[in-house]
């Protein structure tokens, strides 16, 4: 890379945002410097990536597990699995794209893929349980993760002495050392983490919070290399309880990329990391490490375009606005780059590609949109008894309530039913109806006492927010996600039988010739493999000759 190009960006850009957002004379200066160095779009992206990875590489480096060897992968099975989550995308979006754009990357992939048209993500349909479903094979009942932000009756507050038990648990960008910096200011700030009184009042990192192991841990302990890229340093949780599941974890902070265009640049940053990994290097492109056995990333642009005012959908059939369609095209072009790189490296035959989403976004039909009154639920609970609400998460398209006195649950539910229409409440889960879906809140310290599903189209967002869609609830538009599994030996196949994204994890291990029951969640919940996959055919696939 040209040193002058690198120096220009390294000196002037605190975060890698599109230079159009820099104002005044500084913008003119940057434009001049850019002109002088004759930056192309590709050069800008290369410079951004170099700056970012230089910041993130030191805090992402991981030592090899003690005593671990890296044996050559089996030659009688798929050697690599690429897992891609297109956050926000619905199954209807994939179906429409394949029909309307037959030359798109996704349409071409579908010709050699098993497409599950009736796939559902977790409930709640939040990013954390959504991704954990894919990488553990389990529901929130076994992962212990209900939502990105929640409440735990067994933990203590950050910066406390653990004398008081019960605290809100926050695992979003707010636990970064600096959430406006692309590297999170150096990662997670331990002082912002909840504490575990049973373990000497020590901080609970995201990976400590997970109750079951992940595919990354299983594959790494079997001698494979692992890599993942996602939107916050808090995605440390993919490491699993060992804290060491991912060899190469790349988590640039998405908060530092505001607006749709900058979110596309953010996705480009992670795509560049994937291309480096396909080339057999780490995400920075600086070290030869070999192509990962399991690797992947999430895409953000579609979800941002769905949520942003002026974007979203035109009607309930899934017809897209110009900005949402642009985000879809940009993401599809990124997929084409990834597939081209796999082809260039002769890795298509030895790689299984899985495309899905952690969640959808609601509503699709813009006429159903309604912003909830965020004061109604807490005021109603307080009317039963002041201080009864220990924890509350009104986020996206679901509300979760933890009570300080669980014996008053029925009283709170009765009060909520009196405001059901005013508050836009479709369903209240509590008592036996809640226990049909989740662990008993009296025995599991993380399970809410009450879960509220709002009426279709209603979302819980901050006052004054211009968001037009969100996720988290049980609505079809929250949970209906694409699921496409590609291999060049496959023909086109569509399976309409209902499946869950939790079935991805055991299917990945099976495709790699590993035992799915090495996953804790699979053993506990008896998670089945995805139907319709010819694992015998995959294990007979001989990798194409070429550099690995």
Where are these regions (language model features)?
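Acidic, His- and aromatic-enriched active-site or binding-groove loops in soluble protein domains
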Residues: 140-148, 243-281, 317-332, 373-393
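Metal-dependent active-site segment of extracytoplasmic phospho-/sulfohydrolases and closely related
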Residues: 330-372, 508
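Active-site His/acidic residue clusters
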Residues: 232-255, 281-330, 337, 367-370
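Short, structured active-site-proximal loop/turn typified by the sulfatase FGly-forming signature C/S-X-P-X-R
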Residues: 94-149, 225-227
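Active-site neighborhoods of enzymes that stabilize oxyanions during catalysis
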Residues: 191-194, 208-213, 387-514
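Catalytic-site neighborhoods of secreted/periplasmic enzymes
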Residues: 173-258, 519
């Amino acid at each position: 890379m040209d040193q002058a190009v690198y120096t220009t960006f390294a000196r002037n850009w605190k975060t890698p945002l599109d230079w159009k957002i820099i104002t005044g004379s500084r913008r003119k200066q940057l434009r001049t410097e850019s002109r002088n160095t004759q930056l192309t779009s590709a050069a800008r992206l290369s410079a951004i990536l170099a700056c970012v990875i230089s910041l993130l590489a030191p805090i992402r480096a991981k030592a090899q597990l003690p005593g671990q060897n890296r044996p050559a992968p089996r030659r009688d099975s798929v050697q690599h699995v690429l897992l891609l989550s297109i956050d926000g995308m619905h199954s209807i979006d994939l179906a429409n794209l394949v029909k309307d754009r037959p030359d798109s990357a996704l349409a071409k992939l579908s010709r050699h893929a098993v497409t599950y048209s009736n796939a559902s993500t977790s409930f709640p349909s939040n990013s954390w349980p959504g991704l954990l479903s894919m990488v553990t094979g389990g529901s929130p009942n076994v992962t212990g993760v209900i939502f990105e932000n929640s409440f735990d009756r067994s933990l203590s507050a950050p910066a406390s002495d653990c004398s008081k038990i019960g605290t809100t648990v926050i695992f979003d960008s707010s636990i970064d050392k600096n959430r406006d910096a692309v590297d999170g200011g150096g990662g997670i700030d331990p002082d912002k983490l909840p504490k575990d009184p049973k373990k000497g009042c020590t901080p609970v990192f995201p990976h400590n919070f997970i109750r079951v192991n992940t595919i990354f841990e299983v594959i790494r302990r079997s001698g494979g290399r692992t890599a993942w890229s996602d939107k916050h340093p808090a995605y440390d949780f993919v490491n699993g309880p060992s804290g060491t599941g991912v060899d190469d974890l790349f988590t640039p902070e998405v908060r530092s990329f505001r607006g749709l265009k900058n979110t596309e640049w953010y996705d480009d940053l992670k795509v560049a990391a994937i291309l480096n990994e396909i080339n057999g290097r780490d995400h920075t492109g600086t070290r030869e490490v070999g192509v990962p056995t399991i690797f992947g990333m999430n895409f953000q642009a579609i979800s941002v375009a769905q949520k942003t005012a002026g974007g979203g959908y035109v009607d309930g059939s899934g017809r897209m606005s110009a900005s949402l369609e642009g985000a879809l095209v940009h993401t599809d072009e990124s997929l084409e780059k990834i597939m081209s790189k796999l082809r260039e490296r002769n890795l298509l035959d030895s790689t299984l590609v899985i495309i899905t989403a952690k969640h959808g976004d609601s509503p699709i039909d813009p006429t159903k949109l309604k912003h909830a009154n965020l004061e109604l639920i807490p005021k109603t609970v307080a009317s039963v008894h002041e201080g009864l609400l220990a924890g509350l998460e009104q986020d996206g398209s679901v509300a979760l309530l933890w009570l300080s006195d669980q014996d008053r649950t029925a009283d709170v539910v009765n009060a909520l039913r009196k405001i059901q229409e005013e508050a836009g409440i479709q369903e209240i889960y509590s008592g036996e109806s809640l226990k049909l879906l989740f662990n008993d809140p009296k025995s599991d310290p993380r399970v809410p006492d009450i879960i509220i599903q709002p009426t279709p189209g209603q979302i819980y967002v901050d006052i004054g927010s211009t968001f037009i869609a969100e996720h988290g609830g049980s609505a079809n538009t929250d949970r209906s996600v694409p699921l496409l599994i590609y291999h060049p030996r496959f023909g086109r196949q569509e399976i309409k039988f209902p499946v869950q994204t939790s079935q991805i994890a055991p299917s990945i291990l099976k495709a790699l010739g590993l035992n799915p029951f090495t996953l804790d969640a699979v053993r506990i919940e008896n998670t089945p493999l995805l139907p319709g996959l010819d694992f015998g055919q995959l294990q007979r696939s001989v990798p194409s000759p070429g550099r690995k």
